[in-house]
Curated annotation (Swiss-Prot):
Basic residues biased stretches: 419-428
Signal peptide: 1-24
The keyword Signal is annotated on this UniProt entry: yes
Subcellular location: Vacuole, Aleurone grain; Vacuole
Record function comment: Major seed storage protein.
UniProt domain Cupin type-1: residue ranges: 38-196, 231-386
Glycosylation sites: N31, N246, N335, N393, N399
Pfam families: Cupin_1
UniProt protein name: Phaseolin
Principal subcellular localization: other
Recorded name of the encoding gene: PHA
Amino acid sequence: MMRARVPLLLLGILFLASLSASFAISLREHNESQDNPFYFSSDNSWQTLFKNQYGHIRVLQSFDQHSERLQNLEDYRLVEFMSKPETLLLPQQADAEFLLVVRSGSALLALVKPGGTIIYSLKQQDTLKIPAGTIFFLINPQNNEDLRIIKLAMTVNNPQIQDFFLSSTEAQQSYLYGFRKDILDASFNSPIEEINRLLFAEEGRQEGVIVNIGSDLIQELSRHAKSSSRKSLDHNSLDISNEWGNLTDIVYNSLDVLLTYVEIKEGGLFVPHYNSKAIVILVVEEGVAKVELVGPKREKESLELETYRADVSEGDVFVIPAAYPVAIKAISNVNFTSFGINANNNYRILLTGKGGPTGKEDNIISAGINPDVLGLMFPGSGEDVQKLFNNQNLSHFVNGSYHKNAQPQPHEQEQQKQQKGRKGAFVY
């Protein structure tokens, strides 16, 4: 997925040529999070759908309501689930496909299908797809560790996603209760009084959709659980790894989603890159990082570029549109999970560093563009530009402190002055 096509290379170079060291001062900068259409703060972007002493369910603000620039994500939502030890999320189904990742802890996930119930044993970094309309329930089998899960929800009924619970609790009503008496007694072949007593009576009703359960039930379900058919983002399946970071990719072709897990060491840099087709939803798990994204100015008639910056930490979300160059620098050890929408036939294009996972291949810029063309694109000679692009010996993750504490040299200051007022990408 890392091999680029020439038009994509040229697009990336147009963006790259608009950057000077530290991104040229001609670019309008967005350092304030409230002015950044791609940034979702953990403090005020999550809405709590349900909460009790056993856990909570939260949903991220809808992308299209957050910014008109995220309209393409109107059919997607992020859901966070947390439960205490020895608890059960009651059976439900939804009018959406789910792609879940276990952020911490372990889980038993039961999928109730026409051919029978399948119970999966999931551990940290395991992922699984829940098909739309499938009845499922979720258990935290541990006795001393919370379970945390992040889910990408993909609706099949616009515009909202609806969870349907079989049973009534103090928090919500069973959807069975919506049917008329004559439909219920005929369907169950039982008097309505018995149906009301067994299914709808307030006595014995659970307080909420997350409930405490006993160890006997956990042991019984665990005996029938299997770990096959699930995929993992753990260290045993790394695609990219060096001293500064690790990366794992999993593509769910049926969902057209690229699932990625990234770890960056403190001081490390995920070099400037972009995705040719995928819109990436980045969810920070742990640590702190600085994200810099370069894209068109918001005014449609403008040809200038903007730099969107954000300091992200646990629970924050950042959206990276397709073809927008981005760089991520770790302030502390940081890790995050990302969901790439439109993953099929997507390429991750590195703008600097070596292009291959082993670091032995030439980077795609110098390998894909003739030195004579490079000489026409940049002020330096084609050979010198090619050498510059080949200076970095690592792929994806590098030491991010090479220019730390360095002051701009006179020629750098002059270059910044010359860049001021220039236009950026073509917008049409």
